[in-house]
Amino acid sequence: MTIETTDNVAKLSSGIHFVSGIDTDAGKTVCTGWLARELLCRGRRVATMKLVQTGCGDYSPDIRLHRRLMGVTLPEDEEGITAPELFTYPASPHLAAKIDGRPIDLAHLIDCANKLAESYDVVLVEGAGGLAVPLTENLLTVDFACAQNWPFVFVTSGKLGSINHAVLSLEALQRRGAELSAVI
């Protein structure tokens, strides 16, 4: 496995990209907002989306942080398109959905991402947790994103153990034939 050193932002100039990381609190939300701001500064029209947000009420705190970092608001935030699935219990998406008593609507998630892609040059879709987090009882987040052919932005950290987690995650993406846009 080799790691390229390139201008990551340039690889993200168009399309839908899925932002994942080594685990919860790896820095995905900050990286998503920062990348969006960098792309905005380069003249791209950018939207961010939180695929599933758990442990929240009627809004996504991650989307709010994206907007603060980007220095913009988006009308799609008010329409619920940028945070289509919100769950109250702080857990993996599949467990939070079960506790809240409603399933995750995968078709709706895809529709929201595609609707954003119609209006913006770049859509950064932030996942919850790491690649192997169950989105539903039968579907891992990584497999959902791969099925959409979304390239990945992978976020790691400097904390102890992160090299191991990063290598295992990157190998999982490689085994699935996933495109990697950036490693941060």
Where are these regions (language model features)?
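Short, glycine/acidic-enriched loop or turn micro-motifs at the edges of active sites
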Residues: 24-26, 53, 129
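N-terminal phosphate/diphosphate-binding loop that engages ATP/GTP or pyrophosphate donors
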Residues: 12, 16, 30-103, 107, ...
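Glycine-rich phosphate-binding loop signature in dinucleotide/nucleotide-binding domains
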Residues: 115-121
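Extreme N-terminal, non-catalytic leader segments
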Residues: 1-21, 25
